[in-house]
Amino acid sequence: MSTATKQRSPKRGFTGWHMVAVMSLFFGTVISVNLVMAWNASRSWSGLVVENTYVASQQFNGKVAEGRAFQASGIKGRLTTEPGAIRYVLTRNGEPEQKIDKVIAVLKRPVEEHEDLRVELHPRGEGAFVLAEELKPGQWIAAMMAMAGDAVVHRQTIRFIAEGRDK
């Protein structure tokens, strides 16, 4: 009796080429996502918080002392915005502050530099200073500096949301 054995071809399982394809797809996806994220990050924010971190660290204690002195002076600032205007009112112990000559504001976006503005607000009496400026809608950071003569008497940083005219 002769039995003819039929040879079956071995089933092709998971081969090295399959592993190469899986690894290529995985790392290709990771690298592609990283490139897209890096491109978006480089277009939206410089990443610069301070120009020189060592110098900033040396100035930290002085800035803390200055902040405590401003707080002890009793001067408080309140920023309000409306379409086409920014209003900053300074008070000392609940009364309008009269000794301040000018207020300078640095208006900037939290994550971009190209829309930053440095402006001087115009006095309107009763401790109020106004800027007739149309800000684009969205989040802003206002670094306010109130001055009497050449001396800075109050400094405040305020985060706010400017609304557009259509709201």
UniProtKB/Swiss-Prot annotation:
Record-annotated membrane-spanning stretches: 19-39
Native organism: Rhizobium meliloti (strain 1021) (Ensifer meliloti)
Record function comment: The four proteins FixG, FixH, FixI, and FixS may participate in a membrane-bound complex coupling the FixI cation pump with a redox process catalyzed by FixG.
Record keyword Iron present: no
Chief localisation class: membrane
Tagged with keyword Ubl conjugation: no
InterPro entries in the cross-refs: FixH, FixH_proteobacterial
Top-rank taxon: Bacteria
Full protein name: Nitrogen fixation protein FixH
Keywords from the named record: Cell membrane, Membrane, Nitrogen fixation, Plasmid, Transmembrane, Transmembrane helix
